[in-house]
């Protein structure tokens, strides 16, 4: 019985470390400028551009859709384009959620870049300053 318990404990411990992701140290990030905010009925379209470490010049378009009448949370759907420093263009769909607290909005989403990389991404968006502070955590590296 003791051996069975120790085996089970070891399996749980090992499995936890095998499949967990480290969200304490971002792989990279940067600051993007808000270029446009276009309000709609229950949604807003937003575009951003700027520099992200590891990716170079980044261009992003989001549609933020509200899920409640107070318009303080919802879903986001978008596209990203990046021109790497070597001139290669990479693309990604963006899917996630957002939460607004006054003039500050938090974005949480994943990307699936066409080079095989997968990232979990967090943005701190300041609507008044028209800036977004970006952090990304690599879940899987590129295929190359």
PLM regions: where:
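Short amphipathic alpha-helical "recognition" segments used for binding
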Residues: 6-7, 139
């Amino acid at each position: 019985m003791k051996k069975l318990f120790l085996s089970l404990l070891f399996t749980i411990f090992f499995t936890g470390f095998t499949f967990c992701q480290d969200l304490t140290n971002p792989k990279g990030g940067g600051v993007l400028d808000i270029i446009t905010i276009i309000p709609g009925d229950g949604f807003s379209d937003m575009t951003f551009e700027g520099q992200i470490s590891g990716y170079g010049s980044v261009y992003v378009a989001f549609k933020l859709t509200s899920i409640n009448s107070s318009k303080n949370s919802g879903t986001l759907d978008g596209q990203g384009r990046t021109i790497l420093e070597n001139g290669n263009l990479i693309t990604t769909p963006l899917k996630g959620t957002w939460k607004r607290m006054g003039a500050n909005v938090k974005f949480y989403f994943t990307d699936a870049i066409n080079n095989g990389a997968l990232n979990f991404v967090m943005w701190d968006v300041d609507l008044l300053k028209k800036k977004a502070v970006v952090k990304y955590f690599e879940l899987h590296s590129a295929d190359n």
